[in-house]
Amino acid sequence: MSIFRFFTRQQASAPQARERLQVLLAHERASYGGQSDLVAVLREEILAVIAKHIKVDREKVSVKMDRGDQVSTLEVDIELPLTAKKGRAA
């Protein structure tokens, strides 16, 4: 060990610790609280896109997200009316 190395300033570990904490917090949010927020946002966006083309009762739409070890699935169930009115002429 060199005497010069002893007096030099060590690299700050704060940026690394901050980055690790952010990754940990993002993971925790995704596995607990973030899922319901994401599903709510996806539901509203999906309804907005579908409403451009056909009239759908908002109460007859369900969106569910399941997370597994390897795969996450998003299930969307929409009850369409028998006479779907087209929004645009083809």
UniProtKB/Swiss-Prot annotation:
<protein>
    <recommendedName>
        <fullName>Cell division topological specificity factor</fullName>
    </recommendedName>
</protein>
<dbReference type="InterPro" id="IPR036707">
    <property type="entry name" value="MinE_sf"/>
</dbReference>
<dbReference type="Pfam" id="PF03776">
    <property type="entry name" value="MinE"/>
</dbReference>
<keyword id="KW-0132">Cell division</keyword>
<comment type="similarity">
    <text>Belongs to the MinE family.</text>
</comment>
<keyword id="KW-0131">Cell cycle</keyword>
<dbReference type="GO" id="GO:0051301">
    <property type="term" value="P:cell division"/>
</dbReference>
<dbReference type="GO" id="GO:0032955">
    <property type="term" value="P:regulation of division septum assembly"/>
</dbReference>
<comment type="function">
    <text>Prevents the cell division inhibition by proteins MinC and MinD at internal division sites while permitting inhibition at polar sites. This ensures cell division at the proper site by restricting the formation of a division septum at the midpoint of the long axis of the cell.</text>
</comment>
<dbReference type="InterPro" id="IPR005527">
    <property type="entry name" value="MinE"/>
</dbReference>
